Amino acid sequence: ELENEGLVEYVRNAGCSVKEITFEESFEIYLMRANYEIMAVRLLGGKIPEETLQEMEEILERMKSLNVDEYDQLFSYDNKFHSCLIRMTGMKSLYKAWKSLNYGNIVTGYNLASDKKAVIKRQYPIHKELLEACKSRKKEEICRVLSDHYMGTIHRLLKEQGMTEADTKFSLDFLIS
């Protein structure tokens, strides 16, 4: 099942390992996730339902108290947190398309886990900022924070791989506005 979800690769006579993911694959996944989430916010005009905000707050609190031994839960919480924005639309096909990208977030997280403590530490404040923007119910503010959230990840991936935008075939000005 994990192989079908794209999380692990099986090599005959060698066993299973976490799938390697290229920058281009990560870029594509984050491009799509960001645009789906921005679209969800725009569909509701930024009016995030109270129950969605409550769920996001609960997930954020769990994320806040993670330690290095619980690193594997970080990306599960991240996916749950962001899924709130998609699920609030009630659009099943949108949710299915968004959810199909979860593996990329998980694999990217595991492949770049050189400093798990630093990764855990930065997750709370960036998700707190997103939650606060959602609480404002200001559509453009929420979309800006979402864009910054995903662009921060893209720029961090580039830096960690010793790359710049010039090293990619993509423009990093890709989010819908």
Task: State each model region's role.
Residues 1-46, 162-167, 171-177:
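Short linear motifs at protein or domain termini
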Residues 36-67:
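Amphipathic alpha-helical dimerization/coiled-coil segments
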Residues 11, 94-98, 142-144, 166:
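Short, hydrophobic secondary-structure boundary micro-motifs
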Residues 58, 64, 103, 111-177:
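C-terminal all-alpha effector/ligand-binding and dimerization domain
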Residues 36, 59, 66, 70, ...:
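Amphipathic coiled-coil alpha-helices
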